[in-house]
Amino acid sequence: MISKEKKLELVLKFGGSQKNTGDTRVQIAILTEDIESLKKHFAVNKKDKHSMRGFIAKVNQRKRLLAYLKEKDFNAYKQTI
C-alpha cells in the first residue's frame, strides 16, 4: 500500500487538483505505484499466493484503464505512459 502523502502527490501531478481523484490518469498512477510496491513484496515473499490474487486484479484493472484512456484520449495516454 502506498501512503496518503504519496497518493496526494500523484493526484496533484496527474489530476491537477486535490479533489480530482476519479480521473483515469490518477487511477492509473495510483495503481502503478501499488503494483510497484507489491513487486518488492513478492520478491521477498514468494509463497504469498493470497496477495498474488489481489496483485493480478490490480494489474488487470490498470490494463483496462489504459485501454480506455487510449481509446478516449490518445494524447493523455502517451503522457501517462
UniProtKB/Swiss-Prot annotation:
Signal peptide region: none
GO terms under cellular component: cytosolic small ribosomal subunit
GO molecular function: rRNA binding; structural constituent of ribosome
Pfam families listed in its UniProt record: Ribosomal_S15
Coiled coil as UniProt keyword: no
GO biological process: translation
InterPro entries: Ribosomal_uS15, Ribosomal_uS15_bac-type, uS15_NS1_RNA-bd_sf
Keywords, in A-Z order: Ribonucleoprotein, Ribosomal protein, RNA-binding, rRNA-binding
Keyword presence, RNA-binding: yes
Subunit and partners: Part of the 30S ribosomal subunit. Forms a bridge to the 50S subunit in the 70S ribosome, contacting the 23S rRNA.
Similarity comment: family membership: Belongs to the universal ribosomal protein uS15 family.
HAMAP family linked: Ribosomal_uS15_B (MF_01343_B)
Role description: One of the primary rRNA binding proteins, it binds directly to 16S rRNA where it helps nucleate assembly of the platform of the 30S subunit by binding and bridging several RNA helices of the 16S rRNA.
Name of this chain's protein: Small ribosomal subunit protein uS15
Organism from which the protein derives: Mesomycoplasma hyorhinis
Lineage per the UniProt record: Bacteria, Bacillati, Mycoplasmatota, Mycoplasmoidales, Metamycoplasmataceae
